Structures are given as C-alpha cells and as structure tokens.
Amino acid sequence: MESSNHLPNKDSDTVSVTPVEFSNYQCEINPGFNDFLKKSGFEDFGFKFNVVTILGSQSSGKSHLLNSLFNASFQTMDASKGHSQTTKGIWGSLVLSKDTSMNATVVFDSEGTDSRERGEGRLTFEHRSSLFCLALSDVVIVNIWYNSMGNLTGSNYGLLKTVVEANLELVDTNNEENYKTVLFFCVRDWSPSLSPLNVVKDYVLNNYMSSIWNEISKPARFENLGVESLFEIRVFGLSNAVTQSESFEMDVKEVKKTWNSLKPREYSRRVPSDGFFVYSKNVWKTIIEQNHLDIPTQKEMLSSYRCSEIKTMILESLTNALPELKEKDFSEYLMGLLKKVENQYFSQASRYDPVVSKKVGKELLEQVCRKFQPFFESALGDYVKKLAVESSSLLDKEFSVNSSGKELKVSNARPYTVWPNFSKKCEELQKKQTEKLSHHLSSFKVTFKSTVSFEFEFEYQPLKDHLNLLVSSEFEVLRSRHLELLKQQLDSMCNSCFALVKNNMMDRSLNEDQFWDYFDELFDETHKNCVDQLTTSYVGLVKGATRTEFEQLSLVLLLKATQSNFEELQNNLEQLLLERFDKFFNYQEFKGELIPTEWHKQSAQELNNRYKESKEDALTLLQVLKTTKTKKLPSFDANYVKKNQYFYSTLEGPVSDKYSSPLTEQFTIELTNSCSKKFMEMYKNAQVVQNAGTSVSSWRNIPPVFWLVLLVLGWNELRAAFRVLLKFYILIPLLIVSYFTFSYSANKLLGPKANEYVKPVRDKALSLLTALFAWFVRTLHMIASKSSSFKQQTKNLKMAKKGNKNRDSDDEYVGKTVTKSSHSIYKHREPMDINLIVDHDEVEAEKNNLPCWRAAYASGPARPQRHLCVICGFFANYKCRNCATRRIEAINSYYCSLRCLEVHNETNCGKAVHLAQW
C-alpha cells in the first residue's frame, strides 16, 4: 500500500523508497520485504546503515513526522474522512542519501497504541511492537501530544515502562559504559507560549523516565545508577504542522540535525545489511512466540563484540604491514608475528570473558595465518616454477628430437614407437612432481603453543593447482611440438603421394576420368596408410583421443595438404606443360627407355606430325585440371574440438571438400597461348638441327683414321706449340696469374673458408718455385762448366784445322752429299738423332775415300752428351745441317728452337735452311 499524502522536504538531500509492509495486522511477516531490500541495493551497504522506529498513540501524526524527517512516503490519515486507524501492522521504508558515502536508513512506522480497533488485544501488540523497535533501533522516536502530557494512557506511560524494562535485558553497563539507547521525545503541538521547552524536558525526564526507573525492579548493579546510564534522551517541541507549518519545518530540521550528530557510523546491532531481514524476522518471531527477547547474556555479547573489535583492529593494522617474503624466511617471520599479535590482542582482551577472548584470539591467529596465504603461495611460487621447469626438462629429455638425418628420430628411435607413451609419461611426471611438492609443503605446518594453542595448515591446493597448471602448460608446449612433427609426417605422406601424381601427369595416355579415379584411389590408400601408421602415435600424444577421431582428423588434414599441393602445382603448371611437351617431342622410346630424337634422320613431314601430336598430348593436362572431385568431409562438434584438439588450430578457415580448385577458362586460354610460343621455339630448334644434318656432313661423321693421320702429320707443330708454352718467360707469368685468379675466385665463392683451399695451393706453389730456383742455379753452374769445356774444344779444333787444310775439297763433296740427304730428311720430317747424322757422314766419306770430320775430335776432349743453344743458352734440340757439313764449325751449330735456328740462318747460312731434330 502506497502513501496518498506525501509531504516532500524541499531541502532534503535524501531519496525515499516507497514503503513496504513488514508485518501485517495479524503479525505475519511479509517475505516481499526481503525482495524490497534486495531490489533497492540495501545488501551492498554492509554495516553502513541505521534503523529508526517510532512509537506513539494512534492518529498522533507518527507517519507525518517520519515523512517530514526523512522525506518518506508513509500513508497518513485523511482527516476529511474522519479519524480512523491508518497504519496497520509494521511498515518499513528505505531512505538513501544522495551522497553515496553516507549511511542508509531503515525507517519503521508501527501501528499506533491505544487503538480502538484493536480492542482488548491492543496491549499485546503494543508490547510486541515496543520490544521489536527497541531490539532493532539505533534511535526510538516517542511521539506524544502536548495536551496529553500527564495522562496515563495518552502519554504512553505504560509503553515507556515496557521500553525501560526491556532495555535492561539488552545492556550491561558494567562492561560497556558508553552504550546507550537513544530516545527522541517529540512533543507535538507545543508552543513557547504554552510552556517553555526546558519545563517540558524536565517534566519528561523527571515525571516520566525517572519515575518509571524508580518504579521498576532492577538488578543490584543498577540500583545506584540513574536512567541516564541506559538512555540518551532528547526532548523536542514541535509546533502545529497545520497552523504553524513554517515553525514546524524548523523544528523538524532541529530534530534531524540532532539525529545526524548522534547516529552511529555503523549499525549498533552489528548485523550486516544482507542479514538484516533474517535478524528482524527472528526477533519478531521470538517476541511473538515467547513474549520476551531470548538473547544471549549481555556480558557474552559485549565480550564477543569487543573482542571482535580488537581482532578487527589488529587485522586492519596488519593489512599494510605484511612484506613479501622468501621461502627460507617465511616460517620464522610468521611465528614471530603470531607471538606479537597474541601479546597485542590479550593486552586489551584479557579484561573480558576468558572463554570468549580465547576463542576470538584463536580466530585472530587463524585469520592472521589465512592473511599469509597469498604470501605463502608467493614464497613457494619459485619452488613450484622450479618443479615445473624440471618436469619439462625431464620430458624433453625423454622425448628428445633428432632431425639431422634423413629420418626423424625421437629418443634415438623411430617416433612411432615412442609417441604412444607420451601421455602416460606426462601423467607419471605430473604425479611425481605433485608428491614432491606435498612433501615439501608439509614442513610449513604451523604449530603455536602459548596463551592460545592451535595448529594451522595452509591451503596447499592452490599451489598444487598452480603446479599442475604450469606443468600442463609446459607439457602442452612439448605436446604441440611433437604434434607438429606428427603433422609433418602426415604432410610428408601427402607429398610422397603427389610425387606419384606428377609421374602420372607425365603419362602420354593421360585423360580426365583415368586421372581422377587414379588420384581418388591413391588418396584413399594414403589416408589408410596414415591411419594405420600414425593412429597410435596420435592417441598417445592426445589423451582421450580415439581412432575414429584421428581418422576424421587425418582426412581433413590430408585434404588440406592436397589442396595446397594442387595449388602449388597450378602455380607451376606452365613448367609442367613444357616438361610434358619436351618429353613427347624431343625424346622417343627405344627398348623401354627414352632416348633423344635424332632430328637429322627425320623428314620435315615427320617433324611436323610429331610437333602436332606432342602439343595436343601436352595440353591434355589442362583439360584434366579443369575438373575436380569432391571428398565427403566428417562432421565435428566444434565446441569439443576447438578447446581440446591441437590440429584444428592449424586449419585457417573452413576446408573445402574439393581436391583442387578447377582452372578457369581465362587462365586456360592465357596459359595455352604462353606455352604455344615456347613449343614453337622448341620446334624451330629441331628444324635447325634437321636442316644442318641434311645439308652439311657433320664432323661426327669423319672417320677416326683421318684424325690419326692428322695427328701424325701435325705432330711436330703440336710439340713446337707446347714447347713455346712451357718456356719460363711464358710459364711463370701464367702460373702467377693462375694463382691469383684461383685465390680471388676462392675468396669470392667461399668467403672465410677459402683459406682452407688456398693455403695448400700456396704451399705447393712455393715448394715448386723453390725447386725451380734450385734447378736454375744448377743449370747456370752447368752452363759455366760447359762454356769452359767449349773454349778448350775450340782451341783443339783450331790446331787440327791447321794440319788438315788439304781436306777442303773433301768438305765440298761431303757437303753436297749431306745436303742431298738433308733434303730427303726435311721432306719426310722424320726425327733423327745427331749420332745418326754423323754415322751417315762417315759412311759417305768411306764410300768416296774422304776423311771424316769426326777425326777432328780425335785429339781433343770427348763430346758432351748434351749441347746448349748458342743463341740463348738453353738445352739444344736442333742443329743446322748446312753447318754440319763443315766439321770445324759443327760444334757451334746447336740450337734450342726453330726461332733460334732462324736467327742463325739469317746471320750465317742465308736462305739455305736445312732442319733436323737432334
């Protein structure tokens, strides 16, 4: 039921929520009141709220006063319809401050006392409502009329007596001297002209409260105390709300100001906002069922309250004082802190009930230990990480990968024999590390024995969960690595399949139906091999996986790899077409093998026909790839697959059910035109070879005998050319240039590694130059000795010449004979030793009874076995036949080469040149 007359306060800084019934006329609690509090957000206030209740006679303006004080909207009486009962039961409203940092206020408007409608049962309800208001409220407003002061019933004298008696059950002044129930006496229709406010206050305090305090029976401890020890009493005079509305508003502001100054910062009953409804309901039920408040003794409540306050204060002081600790310092620091906290707590709590204080003290120490739970986990975090890294290293060592060779090795064995044990090994390592952690954590159990004795074990499960998470993460990294290797094995199978496909594409009998049927069978066979070979490995790597799952998964992955291979093949399709054309056009079968085509043996017509057929056969591949086939894909539960399976994360986007993307018509035309041009180039090259073979005899047709004759006839020229190249002034520069060329090329090609190859060559060259230099020195020495020998021989010849002047005529005859012989020798270019020449001269001399020129050597030293060139000093290979006929000059007629011999001819013999090898 909502209020019909709402009197808002224009200066109010609060917002009131529409009142809701708490208890109806029959004293039944309304469950909707709890929903009302929840919807209003009251549960979020904690202890930051206050409770205000009001007591007073029926039709005394209680609801109007609450509306004026808190800007509430309780229903008020419509005087135009006569006096009657307006508020029935107990209603509650929630007043929220516009400043969110301020407390909320729960306002209860209760049914008025002295109700004619209640009849004889009015006293029961008055007693119940009074106890309820006193048990819940931070402040109780007593609303009385000025004109009723002095009356027994109208002034609520009996109600006040009930309030005072009930409060004795709730307060123990011995333990909490400052605790007082606040009573606001609001005297309505008061005016200074009627009576001063001080007189009214004295009347309320003395004639009402003190009189009641003296009349009731009190425990012994309250005998010497006044009513002021239990209550904080304030008396306010309120002007008439109708005739003196402005004065009434000012008086209400004074009441509100006093309330704001006296209200506690937190709810005095220490009941949180989310449990307020349950607390209120239990209090109301207790009052109805037992007619008195069945609450624990105030001493225990006070001890519990104060010890809890001390405990809270100490815990709050520890919040910002806890440091980050290392594992080795944790236990020592914690035990020292517990001793310090215990001493600090009992220095204040020892004045209260020992049972309660020890109980709360134990709770305090336990809560201190619980506050250390995050620091405990942080201190042991490094140890947990160490265990995780250790487990990862052990697993990595157990499944070490070696891919350096041609075949993948895991733990120096074939992966298919090792992978099936992966998940089992992971579980064993994880269990081992968890047991190791549990054993280590048992050393951190807290055993405290002092004023309070207790044992405490930290919550180990978060650390175990953290270890399992880290270990699982490390294992997942290794698992993903091995699954990637497994996927590479699967891709390798697919690539091997495509090697066969490419061979099939080079077949001349290729056609569309045959190719796709062949590929379909090959794909199924590859998939079967993959499942047979890799299923146990996959099941071992992925815990809980099944064979059916891998069959479906491998099919999708193979199809993805197939599409990738076909895409790569289409990118290189032009090269493949050229290879097909080259195979069909430039090669032919011979005894089951391909051999190059001999175009010079082919006719022009055969060449044209072969070109046409090869082109058509090569372009058949385009027609094959313009179509494709589909493969039925398996269906999966995406929610299950994505969070559990590794391979599906590698599939970027959806997978098509087609083996490949068919070639478009435009692409086919462009590719055909491009290939046709290159086909034509091959055709023209074949034409050139064919024309060259038919018009001119090939040098390959020259008989081998011709090459043999050519070698014999040109032997002297070949030897002369090689001798020129091997001379020092040509050979040495060539060697130097070759060495530097080799060094430069090696540095360019090999970089830093070039020294490995250049150094041996350099060492070999240096040793060769050293040997060459030694030979050169020896040669110079030999030349010097030959020179001295030559001088002696010349001297002997001159002496012989003087004694043989009569032989000049014989020399002419011998010269003619030798000249004739030399012409014959030169003509046939036959090698001849000088000894043969000398023997020939002796024979001719004997035939003609002439003296031989060798007789000149009879008295001199023996001829040396080797002769030196008289021009350059090198070993002689030639001699002049023209000079050989003159015996005295024969010793000077040796020459090393044709060039030196020509120099001799120009100077000595003129144009008559007769050569012979020595």
Curated annotation (Swiss-Prot):
Residues 554-626 form a coiled coil. One of its GO terms (molecular function) is GTP binding. It is a multi-pass membrane protein. Gene3D superfamilies: P-loop containing nucleotide triphosphate hydrolases. Keywords: Coiled coil, Endoplasmic reticulum, GTP-binding, Hydrolase, Membrane, Nucleotide-binding, Transmembrane, Transmembrane helix. GTP binds at residues 56-63. CDD domains: GBP, zf-HIT_ZNHIT1_like. One of its GO terms (biological process) is endoplasmic reticulum membrane fusion. Its EC number is 3.6.5.-. The keyword Nucleus does not apply. Residues 46-280 form the GB1/RHD3-type G domain. Its main location: endoplasmic reticulum. PROSITE patterns: G_GB1_RHD3 (PS51715). Residues 723-725 are lumenal. PANTHER family: PROTEIN SEY1 (PTHR45923:SF2). Belongs to the TRAFAC class dynamin-like GTPase superfamily. GB1/RHD3 GTPase family. RHD3 subfamily. Probable GTP-binding protein that may be involved in cell development. This is Protein SEY1 homolog. It comes from Theileria annulata. The lineage of its organism: Eukaryota, Sar, Alveolata, Apicomplexa, Aconoidasida.
